[in-house]
Each structure stands twice: as C-alpha cells, then as structure tokens.
Amino acid sequence: MYSIRLDALAQQLDAQLHGDGDIVITGVASMHSAKTGQITFLSDSRYREQLAETQASAVVLTEADLPYCQVAALVVKNPYLTYAHMAQLLDTTPQPATDIAPSAVIASDATLGQQVSIGANAVIESGAQLGDGVVIGPGCFVGKNARIGAGTRLWANVTIYHRVELGEHCLIQSGTVIGSDGFGYANDRGNWVKIPQLGTVRIGDQVEIGASTTIDRGALDDTVIGNGVIIDNQCQIAHNVVIGDNTAVAGGVIMAGSLKIGRYCMIGGASVINGHMEICDKVTVTGMGMVMRPITEPGVYSSGIPLQPNKVWRKTAALVMNIDEISKRLKAVERKVDNV
C-alpha cells in the first residue's frame, strides 16, 4: 500500500498545510466514506456541513472553508483540480505487467520499442509499430501497419484496425474499436453497394477513450481526433469526423459522418450531432442535445426537454405538436385587436 506523510503531500501539491504534518495518508475517499488515514476534498461550499461529520484524517479545501474544518487541512485555490493530482499520486489501479505473455501472437516484422508489455492472447499483426513503454492488454488486436505511440495503454480486448495511428500517452478502455468500416454505401436500384473505407483514424497525443466506444475509419480522408481529447463510454464517431484539441465528449454521444468539431468544446451525454457541418471552438452542448445545424458562435446550446411529471409532460408534448395551429390562432387574435 502506498503511503505519504501529509507534509510531503502538501509539498507535492503546492498546498498550504494546516495541522499535523506527521499524519500518514494511505488513500483518498469521498467526504462521507473516508476513514482514518484517508484524505478527502471539499470543492463546493454548499456541502461544508459535511466537514463536521467526516472521519477523514485531512481535507483539501479553500481558505474560505478552512474555519469549518475540524481536522488537518490542505488549503488550495482549486480543490477539485488538486483532488485530481492527489488521486494520481494515490492511485490504486494495478500496474501492468512488464513482459510479453507466451500466448501473445506477434508478427515477425512488427516493431516493438523498449519496455513494451503485451498481455495474454493479444495479436500484433504484420508491420505494426509499438513505441517505448506501450502496454497492450490481454485479448487486444493491433492490425497491420498500425502505429501506437510511446506510453500508450490499451486495456483488455481493444481492437485497433489496420493503419490506425494512436499518439503518445493515450489511454483506451476495454471493448473499444478504432478503425472499423464507416457506414458507406451507394444505392443501385434498391440494392446497397458497399463503399470500401480507404482512409484511417489518426488520434493525437494524451487522448483518453472510454469503454465500448467505436470510431470509424474515413471513407477517403481520415477520421481525426486531436490532442488532449477525452471521450466517454459507448460513443459512436462516424467516418471522416474531425474533433479539435481538448474537446470533451460525454457518454452515449452519436456523431454522424464528416462532422467537424472545434477545440475546447464540451458535448453532453446522449447528444446526437448531424454530419457534414461544423461546430466552432468553445461550444458546450448540454445533455440530450440534437444538433442539426452548424454552430458558428461559442456558447452553451440546449435542445433537450427537462424532466417533468408525466401529466405535465403530456400537456407540453400536446402543445408542441399543435404549435403551428396555436400560432395561427394567436396571430388571428392579434389582427382583431389591431383593428379595434
């Protein structure tokens, strides 16, 4: 078990220590579940009453919340960001093996960097290139001439198709498929004719992709995911989509083909975005958004209907379905009033 003295932790986090620096911290936990030896954090002053009840040995908080804290504290400007760094230091995720499993199947002309780890039953095909420190989990498939940058980790059962390019220090969760065929077909008198997808997928550095997400290869040009992008679980990204640097995509999002999303965007969960259009930089789409037109101005956009009691929702739906007729009747009343 990893442990660290509170004063040493304060130094690493650039935090101001209040209380006993000799306390030994062995883990991080939420305010209500933390026990002796663990550290927690308070990032929202609305929950400061929990400070009186927590069993944590120390709390990360702001100067404004310090008077309400009854245990040792680390004072910082941004407790949530500090929590992220603290969790990295106290991470309990198992470290990967540092060898190549005997059951792994590796093509003779695949290129492996230094300190590469490959799990049981993984397959590395001809011409694939793995950079230094790459971790390939059990059951993964890396296709012909794929390239994976240094320090990238694939959890178990990830599929990387031929010629896909992953940057450095990426993290791909289990079940994700990158580089499968895009949904491309031509119609010949009612019969669908498959269009081979001749592009690939190019993913930048420090990209994280959640479990069971699918990213299709391009039809002619490539599907491109920029540097620092984070994508949640069970998203579908169609062929030729381009996502700009540091954009965040929450779970269950569907992006149609040839969509271009700018930098620093945030796409809420279960949103659906039309293809063959652009969304500019610094756009936030709230959850369940349906984006049918280009967005040219930064800002926050919404289209979902918030939760209502069923009886109220039924009335709202009826009004929406009859909005044209209601509008006509309202205009008729306005004309009568104007003529009085």
UniProtKB/Swiss-Prot annotation:
The active site is at H239. One of its GO terms (biological process) is lipid A biosynthetic process. Homotrimer. It catalyses: a UDP-3-O-[(3R)-3-hydroxyacyl]-alpha-D-glucosamine + a (3R)-hydroxyacyl-[ACP] = a UDP-2-N,3-O-bis[(3R)-3-hydroxyacyl]-alpha-D-glucosamine + holo-[ACP] + H(+); UDP-3-O-[(3R)-3-hydroxytetradecanoyl]-alpha-D-glucosamine + (3R)-hydroxytetradecanoyl-[ACP] = UDP-2-N,3-O-bis[(3R)-3-hydroxytetradecanoyl]-alpha-D-glucosamine + holo-[ACP] + H(+). This is UDP-3-O-(3-hydroxymyristoyl)glucosamine N-acyltransferase. It comes from the Bacteria. It holds the Pfam family LpxD. Belongs to the transferase hexapeptide repeat family. LpxD subfamily. GO terms for cellular component: membrane. InterPro entries: Hexapep, Hexapep_transf_CS, LpxD, Trimer_LpxA-like_sf, UDP_GlcNAc_AcTrfase_non-rep. Pathway: Glycolipid biosynthesis; lipid IV(A) biosynthesis; lipid IV(A) from (3R)-3-hydroxytetradecanoyl-[acyl-carrier-protein] and UDP-N-acetyl-alpha-D-glucosamine: step 3/6. Its EC number is 2.3.1.191. SUPFAM superfamilies: Trimeric LpxA-like enzymes. Keywords: Acyltransferase, Lipid A biosynthesis, Lipid biosynthesis, Lipid metabolism, Repeat, Transferase. Signal peptide: none annotated. Catalyzes the N-acylation of UDP-3-O-(hydroxytetradecanoyl)glucosamine using 3-hydroxytetradecanoyl-ACP as the acyl donor. Is involved in the biosynthesis of lipid A, a phosphorylated glycolipid that anchors the lipopolysaccharide to the outer membrane of the cell. GO terms for molecular function: N-acyltransferase activity; UDP-3-O-(R-3-hydroxymyristoyl)-glucosamine N-acyltransferase activity. The gene is lpxD.
